[in-house]
Amino acid sequence: MKYKPTYHHSDVEVTKDEVVYDGFFKMHKRELRHRKFNGEWSEYMTREMMVRSDAICVLLFDPVLDKLLMIEQFRPCLPEHESPWLLEVVAGMVEEGEADEDVARREAFEEAGVEIKRLEYMFRFVPSPGGLVEHLRMYAGEIDSSAVDLEATLGLDEEHEDIKLHLFDTSDVMSLLEQEIVNASAIMALQWFALHGAKLKQKWLATNN
C-alpha cells in the first residue's frame, strides 16, 4: 500500500516570513495558515523555525572485511542525563552548488580519513519538522578499512572537531542498536543496514570481481 500526502504546498498560505536571527543557523518567524482535514482553513498562526541547508549522512561500509566505520565526537546540545559524546555516521552540510557525492567524499576524508569508492542511496528524512527546516539524505559509502588507524583523532581544527574512529563487525549491528545510541541518523542507518546490508554486500562484491 502506498502513502500519498493529503495536501501539498498549495494548501499552505504564508503571509509573513521574517528572519529574526542570521548566524551559523538562521531563525525565521512565519505567519501562516493551512488547510485542515475537513477542507476548511485553519486560523492564522505564528511559528518560529530554525532553517539549515540540506545535509548528507554516510554509513561507511567495507564489504570485503565486513566492517562498519563510525565516528564519535562531542555534541553540545544534549540534555544533562545524556553523554555529549555520540556515536555517529559521517555527515556534512551541502554547500551551494555542491553535489551529494562531493559532500560525502569530503566529509569521509575529513572526519574518518578514508576515501569512498562508490555510494549507494539509502533514504531521505526530515529530523524535526515541527521546528527545523532541514532535509537529510542518507547513503552507504564503500571503503577499504584495512588501513584505518583507530588511534588517530581526526576532524578540522577550524571547526573545533575532535573525532575518534570506531570499527565494528557487521555482525554487531543488532547489538549496537540495542545499546544506548541516541543519534537518530546513526540509528536509522544501522536499521537500514540490518535490513539491506547483506544484499548491498553481495552487489558490491559482485561488481568488484
Predicted regions and their residues:
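Acidic, metal-coordinating catalytic segment for phosphate/diphosphate chemistry
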Residues: V20-L65
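Nudix hydrolase/Nudix homology domain
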Residues: M1-Y7, D11-V12, E72, L78, ...
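N-terminal presequences and immediately downstream first alpha-helices
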Residues: M1-E31
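Conserved hydrophobic/aromatic beta-strand scaffold that supports enzyme active sites
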Residues: M27-K29, M70, M138-A140, L165-L167
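Active-site-adjacent beta-strand/loop module that shapes the phosphate/pyrophosphate-binding cleft
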Residues: L32-F37, S128-L150
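A mid-sequence, solvent-exposed acidic-amphipathic segment
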Residues: F109, E115-P127, L132
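Acidic pyrophosphate-coordinating catalytic loop
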Residues: E18-G23, G39, P79-E80, F125-R137
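Conserved Nudix-box catalytic region and its N-terminal flanking loop in Nudix hydrolases
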Residues: R47-M50, K67-R106, V148, D157-E159, ...
